[in-house]
């Protein structure tokens, strides 16, 4: 059997790659690379993840930098990366940040007219 191209392989959902708040980027890079290689060996073509929800979600420059480390590692390993917001459902709320300055923008319901 031929090995499918990475674009046809499934992505593994990982709700932020957990790490201690004081992790050094080089250590994180090695952990991420090891995780990606393990996933690739198990038939995954990449990951679906988000900025860590553990440490000042979406407002931490450090967390964005660590997400960039993951993105660079995915590129280096030839794997795909999907990024989404995740801190409560429904998705899109960004942990309350979406509506922080505009609470009237919240959807009140969903209607299907056929």
What are these regions (language model features)?
Residues 14-20, 52-54, 86-89:
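Active-site beta-loop-alpha junctions enriched in small/polar residues
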Residues 1, 9, 28-42, 59-114:
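Mature extracytoplasmic enzyme cores
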